[in-house]
Amino acid sequence: MTTNFSILASAKALPTTKVTNQELTQLMATSDDWIKQRTGIRSRHVATDETTTSLAVSVAQQLLQQSRLAATAIDLIIVATMSPDYLTPATAPQVQAAIGAEKAIAFDINVACAGFVYGMQLVHQYLQPGQTALLIGSETLSRLVDWHDRSTAVLFGDGAGGLLITAKPNTTTGHWLGGHYATFGADGHYLTAGQQPQVNPWSTRTDGADSNRWAFQMNGRRVYDFATKQVPHSIEQALMQARLESSDIKAFVLHQANARIVKSVGQKLNLATEQLPMNIAQYGNTAAASEPILFAEMVAQKQVQRGDKLVFTGFGGGLSVGSAVIEY
């Protein structure tokens, strides 16, 4: 299926504080070499004064500036995040207010690290010809990290990225070509974060009240096995729907979870090195923000051109996976 899906602008926003692997060695028993060998990560950005909302607002403002559109031209704002500042109001309505997009409907989605590519599907389904959306992934995962647990603390970073997308008819480039999405809820317990304690005057439960269940808990081997099996399958199914081969794709914009996972996916699909851009070394795993941050850098560095075919793939908590095939 080919429908219009034109990306008019891309942007990213990062906290000013950068934390290196060497700095983490002061908090836990680890080393720079240990982290690099197992994850490919050298540093990550950590929010101090920034919030999930402020990072998302920065991205939205950049998108409007690049596209030269007024905020009142925006019809839809979706923020993908698993680390909102509040349960309510959600992040997207705060972005709407900050930029003055009074006509836009605005809501958040939480599909963890797969959130951005699920947001792409929602934008594709929602937009009518002539309408425009802001799709933003924004995370401050540092609030969900136990900074003494080296199995998870070394992985995550904070940041935001986004796209301004329009369903502009009669264009020769900018199309949605296909997609694939799947959820494996029975395996959801292999990756958890943010457990809320059940506390009220009538409850005898203490779920998470006296523990660190709010922090990331992950069965690394199970998540790795899931990703290296289901991500290639999702990409293959999305390409099949788009009636394309992997050789037709300029770049695979994968969630930057772990360099070993990304490389394994590339090997299973027989992809060329230049088809698998990576920036995890600089930012770590920024969950729903990772694909739009990577894509914004690719555009800025002129690594993609109009008419290029791309695959965006996200995977993670849920457990969930999704792939979107587009023409830029």
UniProtKB/Swiss-Prot annotation:
CDD domains: KAS_III. The active site is at 113, 255, 285. Homodimer. Pathway: Lipid metabolism; fatty acid biosynthesis. It catalyses: malonyl-[ACP] + acetyl-CoA + H(+) = 3-oxobutanoyl-[ACP] + CO2 + CoA. It comes from Lactiplantibacillus plantarum (strain ATCC BAA-793 / NCIMB 8826 / WCFS1) (Lactobacillus plantarum). It comes from the Bacteria. PANTHER family: 3-OXOACYL-[ACYL-CARRIER-PROTEIN] SYNTHASE 3 (PTHR34069), BETA-KETOACYL-[ACYL-CARRIER-PROTEIN] SYNTHASE III (PTHR34069:SF2). This is Beta-ketoacyl-[acyl-carrier-protein] synthase III 2. Transmembrane segments: none annotated. It is found in: Cytoplasm. Belongs to the thiolase-like superfamily. FabH family. The last Arg residue of the ACP-binding site is essential for the weak association between ACP/AcpP and FabH. Residues 256-260 are annotated as: ACP-binding. GO terms for cellular component: cytoplasm. The keyword Lipid metabolism applies. Signal peptide: none annotated. Its EC number is 2.3.1.180.
